[in-house]
UniProtKB/Swiss-Prot annotation:
Native species: Mouse mammary tumor virus (strain GR)
Segments in the Cytoplasmic topological domain: 1-44
Miscellaneous comment in the UniProt entry for this protein: This protein is coded in the long terminal repeat (LTR).
Origin: domain of life: Viruses
Function (record text): Superantigen.
UniProt-annotated location(s): Membrane
Topology of this chain in the membrane: Single-pass type II membrane protein
Segments on the Extracellular face: 66-320
Record flagged with keyword rRNA-binding: no
GO cellular component: membrane
Chain ranges passing through the membrane: 45-65
UniProt similarity note: Belongs to the mouse mammary tumor virus PR73 superantigen family.
Stated name of the protein: Protein PR73
Length: 320
């Protein structure tokens, strides 16, 4: 061993392992086999493990005793209240509304391990379950009691949310008939939908509280013009990655960029007539009266060009 290291090990001013703590752990000049002698044998390790196991067992037993004592005390105080003795969730009266809500216990309901705040949950359950058996809050509480999954504060937050939702629904939900009566009194034309009421203002049907002044018919709702095509069913479609995609199946942003309302509203008869003409032109090489009107200008230049080229190239006319 180098002289310096040996000096440091023998030194009483060791910076990390001070004084006697270092003695017997490292080989020194006086005791070269100290580290071998001090290492624990297998027997020592076994004894230490046994001691640790016994200590843990004692701790567990103590905990179990404490839990049982607390449960006994809690149930004694709880059973004094007669109205809560009905809290047997397997009783048909209280559990009918829970059928279909999830797996039911196969044996009779046994009170499970009581967590610190279960008494408060039970008091809340007493408040909610017996007033209205279909109450979502009662159902939530029963689920929580069975699962033992969430803390009381979480459950309480859920209850508050549910209560707020119920209150809002109560405030909002007039029946459709009541809404119709109220709006008819205003002298407007009213029609009843599945979930709401519509009022006719001008020539459009509006839901209550959505009317924002006179409606202006603008030429387009989209920032870009429609760049796709119409098929024979008069559906708009565009080519995306080599596939024909109907614009109504596109997500909103793509649809917004590609789609716009038609230039003019056509009647069903006009649409059918155009489809028929397209069909005749493709399969029979005749028709296309409509396109003559579209392309015709005052001087007839465009129409003449079309006529000339189509007659020359394809041997057919756009007009009869």
């Amino acid at each position: 061993m180098p002289r310096l290291q040996q000096k440091w090990l023998n030194s009483r001013e060791c910076p990390t392992l001070r004084g006697e703590a270092a003695k017997g752990l490292f080989p020194t000049k006086d005791d070269p086999s100290a580290h071998k002698r001090m290492s624990p044998s297998d027997k020592d390790i076994l004894i230490l493990c046994c001691k640790l196991g016994i200590a843990l067992l004692c701790l567990g037993l103590l905990g179990e005793v404490a839990v049982r004592a607390r449960r006994a005390l809690t149930l004694d105080s709880f059973n004094n209240n007669s109205s809560v003795q009905d809290y047997n969730l397997n009783d048909s009266e209280n559990s009918t509304f829970l059928l279909g809500q999830g797996p039911q216990p196969t044996s009779s309901y046994k009170p499970h391990r009581i967590c610190p705040l279960e008494i408060e949950i039970r008091m809340l359950a007493k408040k909610y379950i017996f007033t209205n058996k279909t109450n979502p809050i009662g159902r939530l509480l029963v689920t929580m009691l069975r699962n033992e999954s969430l803390s009381f504060s979480t459950i309480f937050t859920q209850i508050q949310k549910l209560e707020m939702g119920i209150e809002n629904r109560k405030r909002r939900s007039k029946s459709i008939e009541e809404q119709v009566q109220g709006l008819l009194a205003s002298g407007l034309e009213v029609k009843k939908g599945k979930k709401s009421v519509f009022v006719k203002i001008g020539d459009r049907w509006w839901q209550p509280r959505t009317y924002r002044g006179p409606y202006i018919y603008r030429p387009t709702d989209a920032p870009l013009p429609y760049t796709g095509r119409y098929d024979l069913n008069w559906d708009r479609w565009v080519t995306i990655n080599g596939y024909k995609v109907l614009y109504r199946s596109l997500p909103f942003r793509e649809r917004l960029a590609r789609a716009r309302p038609p230039w003019c509203m056509l009647t069903e008869k006009e649409k059918d007539d155009m489809k028929q003409q397209v069909h005749d032109y493709i399969y029979l090489g005749t028709g296309m009266h409509f396109w003559g009107k579209v392309f015709h200008t005052k001087e007839g230049a465009v129409a003449g060009l079309i006529e000339h080229y189509s007659a020359k190239t394809y041997g057919m006319s756009y007009y009869d």
